[in-house]
């Protein structure tokens, strides 16, 4: 490779050590795990007294990606152990999941808990002063018995799928899998080739999860956004990998009051959602979504929404936007937000909008999953996109990123003969006056049901710098100046996307492609009487 002496070959991205930068340069935006993971590792190494975290997924087997991290070990198992041995307390809440309908992530959670338990025992044996508290936290809300009874056949079918999967394993592997899914075993009768679903009672269903992704260090520094910690989520800014391995995400680093408030939130949210204490009022720095268990479930499938600060902030910001809105999200399925955007577009002929989405949901693009929940999600997104397209007209650009290489399949992992880049970021910009970075997607689940957390920025210089970093990530290096300016960006991105779509993949510039509306319109299906927050 050019620039390397002799026969040296540059190692692949997952093997290279990635730079950390100045941890005191705050606030800071990090694009992809290439930038974010080394920072998180360095923050652990710098922590003096305590680390408090809440993640949907936190896998201690995740490799370390910074030179600083690799100086103490190979993976997060080693880094957490090293941190405890330095006398730093570590507390982590990892989301647990419905063992029937989300058994894979349920298993991952308990595998992580077992690994962290081993870390704690090793630290104790070494005489470490630091204490580790690792909690697997399932949301306390449950689907009401009457609603579960109506879904009896569907639930038993899910259990049968798990039994079929277990039945294909050797006995030792099956025993290990069941041990790693402590919530599933109670819904299965028998063993080996004689397993069958329990007839009664109907298994519980857990409608919500703790979806937040944040870590606080010494109550002074906050790492927050859309990125969990596992090897699947590692990607670089050039996304130079197969489509199913791409993962575009955004995380920010802030200090001061936001860190202190996030620390307090992590210390109380489990009691709040379980109705063991009142939900704290907003502190003004951290935006949250919180829902609680229902005191009276009746026939409801839903938790009780308690705090919807992220949704409220988006709806209010859209109404106040004057010139430009820029959104990156995994989903765009919130009817209230789509309605607010449509109202704002009709009321203000000067308002423009860029919305960047993945070309398809992850499970549909890479796993071929076509169950009813996937169809319902696509139905909602297609409806929301229709609403804002009618209102904005040519003042709206909806994009989906793809790499500039040829790749063709019959599935939705391909966009115009190129591999898609999977978007998981959750960042929203309103003019250069407000920016929201959070764990919340633009859908009812994130806005009303799941536990979410985010921060806002109001400094125009900071917001502009963050927005330009987002723009420059997608745009080609030689993009025209109008592609970076709010007043002209929509037209410039629309033209660039059209040029890319018309060109062979290898001649395209940047990642910007037009989102294709027809596949979602065709695939989506409405579900009568099912709350949109389900997806």
Model-derived features: positions:
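Charged, low-complexity intrinsically disordered terminal segments
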Residues: 1-535
């Amino acid at each position: 490779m050019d620039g390397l002496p002799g026969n040296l070959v540059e190692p692949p991205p997952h093997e290279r050590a990635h730079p950390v930068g100045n941890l005191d340069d705050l606030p800071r935006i990090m694009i992809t795990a290439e930038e974010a993971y080394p920072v998180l590792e360095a923050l652990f190494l710098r922590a003096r007294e305590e680390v408090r975290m809440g993640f949907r997924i936190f896998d201690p087997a995740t490799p370390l990606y910074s030179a600083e991290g690799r100086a103490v070990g190979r993976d997060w198992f080693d880094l957490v152990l090293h941190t405890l041995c330095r006398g730093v307390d570590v507390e982590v809440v990892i989301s647990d999941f419905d063992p029937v309908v989300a058994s894979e992530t349920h298993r991952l959670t308990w595998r992580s808990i077992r690994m962290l338990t081993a870390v704690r025992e090793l630290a104790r044996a070494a005489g470490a002063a630091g204490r580790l508290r690792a909690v697997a936290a399932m949301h306390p809300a449950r689907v009401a018995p009457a609603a579960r009874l109506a879904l009896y056949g569907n639930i038993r079918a899910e259990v049968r799928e798990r039994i079929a999967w277990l039945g294909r394993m050797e006995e030792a592997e099956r025993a290990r899998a069941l041990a790693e899914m402590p919530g599933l075993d109670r819904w299965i009768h028998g063993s080996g080739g004689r397993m069958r679903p329990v007839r009664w009672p109907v298994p519980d269903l857990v409608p919500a999860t703790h979806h937040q992704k944040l870590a606080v260090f010494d109550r002074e520094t906050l790492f927050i956004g859309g990125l969990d910690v596992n090897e699947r989520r590692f990607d670089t800014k050039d996304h130079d990998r197969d489509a199913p391995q791409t993962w575009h995400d955004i995380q920010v680093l802030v200090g001061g009051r936001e860190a202190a408030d996030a620390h307090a939130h992590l210390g109380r949210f489990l009691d709040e959602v379980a109705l063991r204490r009142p939900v704290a009022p907003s502190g003004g720095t951290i935006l949250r979504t919180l829902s609680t268990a229902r005191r009276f479930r009746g026939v409801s499938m839903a938790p009780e929404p308690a705090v919807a600060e992220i949704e409220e902030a988006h709806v209010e910001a859209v109404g106040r936007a004057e010139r430009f809105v820029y959104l990156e999200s995994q989903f765009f399925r919130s009817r209230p937000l789509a309605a607010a955007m449509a109202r704002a577009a009709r009321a203000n002929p000067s308002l423009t909008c860029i919305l960047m989405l993945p070309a398809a949901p992850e499970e549909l693009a890479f796993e071929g999953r076509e169950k009813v929940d996937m169809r319902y999600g696509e139905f909602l997104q297609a409806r929301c996109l229709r609403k804002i397209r009618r209102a904005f007209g040519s003042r709206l650009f909806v994009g989906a990123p793809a790499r500039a290489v040829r790749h063709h399949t019959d599935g939705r992992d391909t966009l115009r003969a190129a591999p898609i880049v999977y978007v998981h970021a959750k960042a929203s910009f309103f003019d250069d006056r407000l920016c929201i970075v959070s764990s919340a997607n633009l859908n009812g689940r994130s806005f009303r049901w799941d536990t979410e957390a985010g921060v806002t920025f109001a400094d125009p210089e900071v917001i502009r710098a963050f927005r330009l970093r987002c723009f420059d990530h997608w745009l080609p290096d030689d993009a025209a100046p109008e592609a970076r300016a709010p007043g002209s960006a929509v037209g410039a991105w629309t033209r660039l996307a059209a040029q890319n779509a018309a060109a062979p993949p290898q001649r395209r510039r940047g990642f910007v492609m037009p989102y294709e509306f027809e596949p979602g319109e065709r695939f989506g299906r409405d579900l009568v009487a099912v709350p949109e927050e389900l997806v």
